[in-house]
């Protein structure tokens, strides 16, 4: 479960959000809706431990994300809107990433790529935007984390 209580966050002197409280229960799929600049990406980064709130608390199960506990980190994955994949393939990308996630399932990755009709050995820079998004989603799903945070997965 993800529990957020009285969370504040600002960049320099510009408040992004103030005093928000939310609860995300296990086994559900949630979506964050809002205009650009209201803090959706920032909230995902706080939940994943990549940014730190100014005030308030964020708990994921019994962990405080900002403490970067190794067990916590292997059970959550944040897929940003844009990923720099440079001159590599989904196969090489997931092989480097998967070592950090004990439940990573390479067979599942290959099955997803086949189902999505994307070649795991094509370079990202030769793919269409849609193929790249599908490939990154297959990578994320194959990590088998308890929490999967997707920023603009279909954009």
Question: Model-predicted segments: where are they?
Answer:
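The feature captures the beta-strand-to-loop junction immediately N-terminal to the Walker
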Residues: 33-35
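Conserved structural motif at the start of ABC-family nucleotide-binding domains
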Residues: 2-4, 17-19
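Helix-to-loop junction immediately C-terminal to a conserved catalytic motif
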Residues: 48
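Catalytic Walker B motif of ABC-type/P-loop ATPase nucleotide-binding domains
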Residues: 148-152
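Conserved ABC transporter NBD signature motif
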Residues: 56-67, 71-72
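ABC-family P-loop ATPase nucleotide-binding domains
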Residues: 78-135
